[in-house]
Amino acid sequence: MTKTNDDIHVNKKYKDTVFRKLFGENKGNALSLYNAVNHTSYTDPDDLEYTTLEDVIYMKYKNDVSFLIDKTLSLYEHQSSYNPNMPLRGFLYYADLYRKLIHRSERLYSKHLLKIPRPHYIVFYNGSEKDLAEERRILRLSDAFETDTGAGEYEWTATMININSGKNQSIMDSCHVLYEYAVFVAKIKRYRDSMELKEAIDLAVRECIEENILRDFLEQHRREVCDMCLTEFDEKKYEDVL
């Protein structure tokens, strides 16, 4: 147990996040989010196969959800801080994902072309709008190259989707769980400006339950959600002063 500046005891075993619990443990929620992002209409959650990696050393805490559906390998992350290195993180993550898939097939050295699922990397962002004011932004790995490799020679992207209030309304309308999650996080961020973090989280949870926002989820996992938020938001506060 670690004592923070706000005199909050943070349990460091909680490296999972609310985003991952919502979308990484419920195929129905993940499918709804996929449909909203891709303008599809899949109805059977069993069409979706989770591929989320565990214990990824370059990820500080688990805000990632990966799954396979319709020959597309999706990686979704939530970020409340702007990070220009997301394309590199996604590149490394996908290397591990494809390594697992190729090991399963054991055809890497075949004379025939080995077909792989199409990658689709999305970062859901609800941090400061000073860093991302537009609804979407595509981050490119080539921006990190120390020398110019030539247009189109190699590229890897991360698509940032802004889920702050008033942004990407069509996605929010199509995936109500994402909308409710964004409301919940926004409440915590707003309340922590005027009270201690633990009080802000408790108030946000109570209000969301009263307003029927993630009610069943919060009632069922209230203690765990509070612990995850304490860890995530406390680490976010520390990162902001670095």
List PLM regions with ranges.
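Elongated, amphipathic alpha-helical interaction scaffolds
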Residues: 1-242
